[in-house]
Amino acid sequence: MTLKAAIIGCGRMAGTIDDEITYDHADFIRPYGHAPGYAATEGVELVAASDIDADRLNSWCDRFNVEERFTDHGQLLEQVKPDVVSVTTPAHARANPLVDVVESGVRGIYTEKALCTSQLDLDRIVSAVRSREIPIVYGAMRRYWTGFETARAFLDAGHLGAPQAALIGAAGGSAFHTHSHIIDAAFYLLGDPEPLAVQATLTGCGEDELGIVHSEDDGVAVDTDPAIVHAHVELDNNLRLTCTDLPSLDIEIVCENGVLRGYGDSSRYAVMRRNARYDWEPLPFPDWQARSGTVAIMEDLLRAIHDGTPTRSGLDVIRRGMEILFAMVASHVQGGRRIELPMTERGVSVHSH
């Protein structure tokens, strides 16, 4: 049976991002946007879309051949009754549609990252999805790229001993919009450990200063999606993750007996094994055949719907990544203090993302 899909939010990630992918990359493969992804995935058909901007909605639906279109997502959910919904609104406008989608009784959800911009909204979304036990997948998609899958299999095979730490490049981009990708990839390569504590120093992106806003109810917000100067995340099983000045989206996994390095957002990998203190040798990294990460995500969601298998980027994976990002903000506001997770005070937010 072909499932009915709908998209809420007809912006860049809903489909037009594919226009930007005009370069060769070993793992960055179209289709990337949601509408082209549904068109390339068997067992699902995109039948409806919603956006509050009627002109944008109609232009987008004309381009992607979507007949049913709504400026009110509630009407879409009530009239179309989709099986699967993508929520691709901006992050600051994502929580309410997501909760509405959950409560409408859909069978599966594909949400973009970052999930939301406040801890209160994070708690609302997690509670709603958990109460309905709905399969969910997430737009931090590097864990679905074949290069990262190959790296995870290489590490799991024990060629370098047990992983001990991840170093990720945070020299460019912003924490919620950009580095949610590479933080999630690092967690995937480390085996998805639970975060225990965070320390961070942040700044504004580019020339902008990072403003801090305190509210009367003890909440705190930063006025833009911040850049990461430095961050350290303590993980269970004595693992750790450090955000460094490596080039943006580069990653190193430090193991007992060597290092695996990913360059250029999974463009290339290099492996060095340590035989003795001053005796290191390069190891070959396996070849891989790239595929669309978006299609892989959608296939994962369909398997969960039909077979009940957990998704690779499920609710706990999403929650962990968001808890880390909010804790970075809390740590920065408190002068880089160590913040234990999960945070008991839930008043952190990011104003403009």
Language model features with spans:
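Beta-strand-loop-alpha-helix segment that lines the small-molecule cofactor/substrate pocket
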Residues: D83-V84, P90-A91, A95-R143
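C-terminal helix-rich "cap/oligomerization" subdomain common to oxidoreductases
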Residues: M1-L3, I7-I8, V44, V84-S86, ...
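Rossmann-like dinucleotide-binding domain that binds NAD(P)(H)
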Residues: A162-S248, D316, V348
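Conserved SAM-binding strand-loop segment of SAM-dependent methyltransferases
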Residues: V66-H73
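N-terminal Rossmann-like dinucleotide-binding module
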Residues: M1-F64
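NAD(P)-dinucleotide binding in Rossmann-like oxidoreductases
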Residues: V222-D225, H232-A296, G314, M328, ...
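Proline-aspartate-enriched helix->loop->beta-strand connector
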Residues: V66, K81-P82, V106, P195
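Rossmann-like NAD(P)H-binding beta-loop-alpha module
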Residues: T146-A165
